[in-house]
Amino acid sequence: MSSPLPSERRIFTDPETGARVTQWTSSPALDRPLYFTSPSVTRDDRWLVFLSERDGGSPNFFAIERASGLIHRLTNNTQGSLASYCYPSENRSGIGKSSPCLDPDRNILYYIKGYEFWRVSLDGDRVPQKLATLPAGWWTAFTHVSADGRWLCVPCTHPDAFLPGQSTQWEQLDTVYPLLKDKGLVSRIYLIETATGRSRILAELPFWVTHVNFAPDDSDKLLVNSEGPQSSRHGSPPRIWCVESDGSHHPLFEQNGMRVNHENFARDQPWIIYHGGYEKNGEARRRNFVAARDWTGSPIFEYALEDLPLMHATPMNNPRWSVVDTPEHIAMICPDAQNRSALIPLCRHHSREGFGANQDHHCHPLQTLAGGGVVFASNREGEANVYEVHL
């Protein structure tokens, strides 16, 4: 176990809202929290896990001891970034930047390196252990661990769906699904038993799966997406899908005529939260909303936001509330008794113009499980760093 790095913590007050904000990292390299489908902070509020390229550009994982700010190294990758969703390249080694998921109740981080699944305990000796081997050459994406800690899920997509020479996520979005469709290729949904490392294929789906989520109350229910063009889904599969324990699958609801994104289970309810926009004069980004449905597709709520653009909307501990990033703010959406949405700015994120083009610079705001803050990324200082606005 190596000695920790010194704290980089800085606390300041947002001049617009008066909120207290902690800047947790300040290296000149990329530092960002985990993707919004995984918490970055453990439930006991002791650790904050982040990805950093402070080691000469190769991504590695670190854990901040929140009481002291000390930074503990979790991995020692020197082989760059594995080619995967959001990160196209020709590299078939290194850490998958889209792969980490944190088990927040057992303080274990899971991640992919090369074509292997690894884990490292935040509370133990912090020595990574190999758990399972994945199919060589298949492209991975965001992963998830079940609430009971027994299962990992990882989507793996046939390598022939990925064109050489691409450099951005946006190129992938335009080409991967058409190639899957034209060539009859699939994404496989793998389940890995955390106790043994044994794996099995739960389902083979004829579209590009990049997000997976176990239901919080039932690890036999899996929420997945169909990734594709960033417009309404005419001519392509619906965005949000439900996968049962026998591998059967069905769309959550009919999704034509709207743009839906960033589906996620509520934290302690089997509700599926998502956001999007209805078409308005041919523009799918208009008439925006945040909504929830149950596993059968029945609506629970929908809050209209009119023309307010959202990058992401993630459920808070109150499942009817969401934390969002607008072009200027980290904010909460809190409905009143008549289901009218109220947007409450928490702080300005000051991410620079054009940050949406770089996945690593997306804010990806997520409330901590203990409830006291919202962790997000901001590139206000040039590269992304890890911040938290306190509630």
Where are these regions (language model features)?
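Blade/loop signatures of beta-propeller domains
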Residues: 1-22, 181-188
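Blade-level signature of beta-propeller repeat domains, shared across WD40, Kelch, NHL, RCC1
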Residues: 359-391
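Loop/turn-rich, solvent-exposed surfaces of beta-rich toroidal or solenoidal domains
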Residues: 261-291, 297-342
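Conserved blade-ending motifs and adjacent loop-strand segments that build the rim/top face
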Residues: 256-260, 300-314, 340-369
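Hydrophobic beta-strand positions that form the internal "hydrophobic ladder"
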Residues: 48-49, 109, 149-152, 221-223, ...
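Short, conserved, GDST-rich strand-edge loop motifs in beta-rich repeat architectures
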Residues: 3-4, 53-54, 94, 155-184, ...
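Repeated scaffold domains used in trafficking and secretory/extracellular systems
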Residues: 34-38, 83-89, 94-101, 138-144, ...
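Asp-box/WD-like beta-propeller blade repeats and closely related beta-sheet repeat scaffolds
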Residues: 77-187, 201-204
